[in-house]
Amino acid sequence: GSARFRWLVMGDQLAEARATVTALLREVRRRGQVESEVHFLRGLAETELRSGHCGRALDLAREGLRLAHDSGIGETASAMLTSLAEASGGDVDRGLALAREAVEHAEQDGDTMYLSRALGALGYAQLVAGDPAGTVRSLRRVRELEQSLGITDPARGRWQGDLAEALVRVGEPAEAQDVIDVTREHALRLGRESVLAALDRAEALVRAAHGEHDAAVAQLTSAQDRFAKLGYGLEEARAAFALAALRDRRSPAVFDEATRLFRRCRALPWLRQVDEAVSVPEPPVEAPAEPAVLDGLAAMERQVAALVMEGATNREIAARLFISVKTVEATLTRVYRKLGIRSRVDIVRLAAGRRAK
């Protein structure tokens, strides 16, 4: 029964997985088998989380964690699952704390398998908390650990899309594309549809970072539709959120669908991200800068410089390009060096001078 449940979850058969694990949980409770009850509570919570039922998943995960603490059985695994549930539907700080606790225990035990899973939970919580650099650090370690363990099935941890997204946000789209390409090969071979949709969502962000707006919108729209058909409610909402961020923010309704979907999931930490995005105003659209000003800059540097010329703040640039404010600052430093200037004011003056000529 347990093996069949895992096979169903990895194969995106969420309704069947829920029915299977619910029956298993009912049976072990009837028999008073506490160790199995802790295990199957985690399984049911995981299924609900993947289905986008974040409130239900959080209740089950917390129940399982209490039982694990009381019995001394499966505490690390329960902490990892509860971390994912907290970061999705509860308190993201609690999610971070639980994941770090699980990482510490796995390191103390020398358990490489559990360490990779705990770091995966930590990386996800860091992404939700707005720390993409932390996500990159955690999930690069997961990649190294899984390679050392010979794990090639991306449905085991499902961290690859999050790593790619975080890499885009810290200004590393080339590495993000490499993660996507390598993972897609395995996902296609194994038929992991939800993983492929997550990779498409991340690849759309790579395209957006390269200025391929229309292609990014088309890929995100497709990814959202695939998640909806598979029944992955939270992932569908995340795709809608990414899509909204690419659209014209002067329309007050641009984030409405993402808000509706996250509310349906009871994904409170994600709703807070939407609220923050809504509060970032769209910079005014002005005439495009003279291309010659930006010759010699890399793609990301050109985009950042062009937005500076439009009058965008670093925070606004970060929101529009799906990168962190620190990445914007580092990119601007490179722009200053290449253009032989000292400040963002000089970029605007340089552009104005070229236009005057």
Regions found by a protein language model. Give the residues of each.
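Helix-coil-helix junctions within alpha-helical repeat/solenoid scaffolds
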Residues: 4, 11-290, 294, 312-313, ...
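Helix-turn-helix DNA-binding segment
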Residues: 279, 285-357
